[in-house]
């Protein structure tokens, strides 16, 4: 399943980049994120809870930043499983920043997600709808936090 989106934030590209590559900041924007633990400079252990239909899951996974082209591109590879054995997933994501002006950045992302197991039985339509809902919540939270962070900076 491929999920992609574009949105614009009002902040300088450097601030957006620094926020984006900080997993603790990003974790606060991800609905259901319970934990982010640094393994090394590019790899993090993450626990996120979510629901798809009647199934509630807690995914434990690692995410690794495998390509970094500062301040415009980030490639992340993730792999993990539900702690309750409802399924597992792999994901590759590309995030691109494009400076529109000194105070505006377009963010585009594309994620290719492969889910297997009981959770996959709900089909792409239901999982896509849930992913869209989570994506919208993430974008709203990300935008609010980065724009608030900009206002707090002298």
What function would you assign to each model-found segment?
Residues 38-81, 137:
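Glycine-rich portal/gate segments that line the openings of hydrophobic small-molecule binding cavities
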Residues 1-47, 51, 153-154:
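Hydrophobic ligand-binding cavity/cleft-lining segments
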Residues 80-129:
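Beta-strand/loop substructures that line and gate deep hydrophobic ligand-binding cavities in soluble
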Residues 5-7, 34, 60-67, 90-99:
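Hydrophobic/aromatic beta-strand elements that line small-molecule binding cavities or substrate pockets
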Residues 118-154:
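A conserved amphipathic terminal alpha-helix motif
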């Amino acid at each position: 399943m491929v999920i992609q989106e574009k949105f614009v934030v009002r902040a300088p590209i450097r601030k957006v980049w620094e926020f984006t590559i900080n997993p603790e900041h990003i974790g606060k924007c991800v609905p259901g994120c319970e934990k982010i633990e640094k393994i090394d400079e590019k790899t993090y252990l993450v626990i996120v809870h979510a629901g798809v239909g009647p199934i509630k899951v807690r995914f434990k996974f690692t995410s690794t930043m495998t390509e970094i082209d500062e301040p415009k591109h980030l490639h992340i590879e993730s792999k993990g499983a539900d702690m309750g054995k409802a399924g597992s997933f792999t994901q590759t994501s590309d995030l691109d920043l494009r400076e529109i002006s000194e105070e505006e950045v377009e963010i585009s992302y594309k994620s290719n997600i492969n889910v297997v197991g009981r959770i996959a039985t709900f089909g792409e339509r239901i999982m896509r709808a849930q992913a869209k809902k989570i994506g919208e919540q993430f974008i709203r939270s990300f935008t609010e936090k980065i724009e608030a962070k900009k206002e707090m900076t002298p």
